[in-house]
From Swiss-Prot:
ATP binds at residues 120-126. It comes from Lactobacillus acidophilus (strain ATCC 700396 / NCK56 / N2 / NCFM). It is found in: Cytoplasm. Cell wall formation. Catalyzes the addition of glutamate to the nucleotide precursor UDP-N-acetylmuramoyl-L-alanine (UMA). One of its GO terms (cellular component) is cytoplasm. Its main location: cytoplasm. This is UDP-N-acetylmuramoylalanine--D-glutamate ligase.
Length: 459
């Protein structure tokens, strides 16, 4: 870890505990900062908060001490990415011109290990996992490692102290995290895709959302690389305006891109890299994710043998077209990460077999007309639950689906979907909606889906 002096003896307020709040607090202590930790939750019995308190951190829980920002001098406010900028502490810090930063920027500023950053509306976690595995396969030959960190669930601050200059950090970075970033310099940055109707409750407008995503490349150097989606022309034009890095592109269909999906192979302008039939992950979107991972991994030193070793064995990230089981000839997949319409549009065409689809969730005020052509082509029957069940049913009727079953809960939906199938079919859980009407997170929703599938085996 670099012994930077940026935060040495500086007064810093960490806003929001959580996983990343705890990790960045520990890192800042190592860097010599004077810390105050604040969370609106009561922290008196919180083990992590008390652990920090024992190390000299001032811990304030149960409320936001807005006046404290005026009464005392703070050099930085480190904000948990999930906390909106409307938060009174954040607003007051802005009024007082206190720099507001996030955990990734703090951690990456002192990383000895080179790092790559991957973001996107859909596909970033799978791409991060593929990239990390390929690079780890490459680095293990010399006794070193690639670490998957960031929005994937492992705070960057947790890994930076142990990662050496010969390791590589593969960082999944979200729009929430990027919004607060002012200066990161990944060796390679990538935007897998950008879609509308994603996190607009946080960013307010699509333009704000795109601007946040572009922070992944905005402060790169001219000898760094940026991987861009050749098929999203409007976004590509903005990326070309903003990015100072050397650009490489990938495409599903256009063979003018640097990396593309050929008839039988994943290809670059220079070579055929890997036979598509040998890749375990289902769906065209996962071939695109694979192209991004390949582009990054090659720039960081991996070869085709490293790539083949991973792509021929990796079966997917949890909750992302995750294969669950085969039950009486029916393959069952958990795609709970499908929290928006765009995610469902890549999951539904992923299979050649007839599909019974389970969908539904939080109503964000959208129609589902964009799914009608896919319903018509791929879905033989559909089971719907949650706040959006009737809106989805309208789209299913427009598609001419004859068997439309409406239930109240996911627990009811799973056995009903099984009843509609026959051997050779696929049961696909791809909600096309956020989980918050009935579940706390998409992970919790996916775990319950798997549990309900297991219950089918006992009936």
């Amino acid at each position: 870890m670099k012994d930077i002096k940026t935060y040495d003896n500086k007064n810093i307020l960490v806003l929001g505990l959580g996983k990343s709040g705890f990790a960045v607090s520990e890192l800042l202590l190592k860097l010599g900062a004077n810390l105050t930790l604040n969370d609106k939750a009561d922290l008196d019995k919180n083990e992590k908060a008390q652990e920090l308190k024992a190390k000299g951190v001032r811990v304030i829980g149960g409320y936001h001490p807005v006046d404290l920002l005026e009464e005392e001098h703070f050099d930085y406010l480190v904000k948990n990415p999930g906390i909106p900028y409307e938060n009174p502490m954040v607003k007051k810090a802005e009024e007082l011109d206190i720099p507001i930063i996030t955990e990734p920027e703090v951690a990456l500023s002192c990383s000895d290990a080179p790092y790559v950053c991957i973001t996107g509306s859909n596909g970033k976690t799978t791409t991060v996992m593929l990239t990390q595995r390929i690079l780890d396969h490459h680095l293990q030959k010399t006794g070193h490692h690639a670490y998957a960190v960031g929005n994937i669930g492992v705070p960057i601050s947790e890994v930076v102290p142990k990662a050496t200059k010969d390791d590589i950090l593969v960082v999944e970075i979200s729009s929430f995290q990027l919004l607060g970033v002012t200066d990161i310099k990944p060796k390679v940055a990538a935007i897998v895709d950008i879609y509308n109707n994603v996190h607009l409750d946080y960013h307010k407008t699509f333009e704000n959302y795109v601007d946040a995503k572009l922070n992944v490349t905005r402060t790169q150097n001219s000898d760094d690389y940026f991987i861009a989606n050749f098929d999203q022309k409007d976004i590509l034009a903005k990326e070309k305006e903003v990015s100072p890095a050397k650009m490489q592109t990938f495409s599903e269909t256009d063979h003018n891109a640097d990396y593309f999906i050929g008839d039988e192979y994943l290809e670059s302008q220079d070579e055929k890299i890997m036979k598509i039939a040998d890749i375990k992950l289902p769906g065209v979107h996962n071939l695109q994710n694979s192209l991004v991972a390949i582009a990054i991994a090659k720039l960081m030193g991996a070869d085709n043998e490293d790539i083949a070793a991973v792509l021929s064995t990796f079966t997917g990230a949890k909750h992302r077209l995750q294969y669950v089981t085969t039950l009486d000839g029916r393959k069952i997949y958990n795609d709970s990460k499908s929290t928006n319409i765009e995610a469902a549009t890549v999951a539904i065409p992923a299979f050649k077999e007839p599909e019974v689809l389970i969908a539904g969730g939080l109503d964000r005020g959208f129609t589902f007309d964009d799914l009608v052509p896919l319903f018509k082509k791929h879905v033989k029957s559909i089971v719907l639950y949650g706040e959006t069940k009737y809106l989805l049913a309208d789209a299913a009727r427009k598609a001419g689906i004859k068997e439309i079953v409406i239930v109240n809960t996911l627990q009811e939906a799973v056995p009903r979907a099984y009843e509609l199938t026959e051997p050779g079919d696929v049961i696909l859980f791809s909600p096309a909606c956020a989980s918050w009407d009935q579940f706390r997170t998409f992970e919790e929703r996916g775990d319950y889906f798997v549990r309900f599938v297991e219950e089918l085996k006992t009936k």
